Amino acid sequence: MFRDIIIKKYTLGAIRMTQTNATRIEKDTMGEMEVPADAYWGASTQRAVLNFPISNIRYPSDFISMLGRIKRAAANANQQLGLLDPEIAKSISAASTEVIDGHWDNHFVVDLFQTGSGTSTNTNANEVIAKRAREIADGLNIHPNDHVNMAQSSNDVIPSATHLTAAKAIKDELIPALEKAQKTLIEKSNEFWEVIKTGRTHLQDATPIRLGQEFQGYASQIELSIDRIKPHLSALSEIALGGTAVGTGINAHENFARAACEILSKELSLPVKETAHHFQAQGTQDAMVSASGAVRSIAIALQKIANDLRWLSSGPRAGLAELELPTVQPGSSIMPGKVNPVIPESVVQVVCQVLGNDAAISAASQGGYLELNTYWPVSAYNLHQSITLLASATSNFDIQ
């Protein structure tokens, strides 16, 4: 199950569309570009596809969905303020809803390792939504920048989508997984309470301890991990939307961000609000670094639990053999009957990945020069991956 989840979320593979060599001509400010005839993106996105043939890694679908939410909220906010024609807003909203639901994921084609502002992916969203909105509106003139991107810039949209994608994953995936694991550990603590065993410090025998007390310690680790991550929901729900290019809010109505944030807050059940510190929000990744640190601490807590279970189940004849872990698969191709602690081992490997992701986020956060940090895509991907990996690994650890 765990492996399947990772494949769905991260092995995005090639773009699957109708196989055809037909193209059409699209134009942007730099001139004409050939674009696949059945593609919903335009010239600027196609330039980015050609510029960045790096990894075949894309922004995760959760991020693309959040971009759709921001575009829909922006269209509705601009309509409320009398800035966007109601029919255009309605069509953009409908097209954005399809993006939210994942119908156009195969048309988000820009590599993750692109311009550090994420402009190419924001442009990709604007072009896909505009083309689909024109179809919905039966040919009404809807422009990617003038209408879909109204009152926005990549420099505030991408940081906002990055924050909210992480916050939503923490709320909907990580915290529930941790809460279930904590409940299981408390149950095991009660079950094992009467078992007295040798305590160990420095891996050497020490004074007696209840097995239930050891599991009580594990449950407390998870409880405190939840307490540490929850404050980051508020920090990540404070977004840069409304700052536009450099944080001054140029070309955006003064009430635009507030209106859009109210919409997003209701949809996501998060305390979404416009930041009071636009220059900080676009020029730094401070909230990302802090949240990643909390995620890292959760990972290390899980590593402690996983490694303890490996030690306590070691053997079965020449080890500690105080616990027996569920037998889930054969452990060796050469030693019949051998069974290994494969589930805890998978957890520890997830921890290794999370620690690497945290290091990458720390490095990317140092790319905040003057009015913009220019390494948003790699931080967005790594924090989201850390959160979802830990959620999946924790759930699997609990279930197995």
Describe these PLM feature segments:
Residues 2, 13-400:
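Conserved, well-structured ligand/cofactor-binding cores
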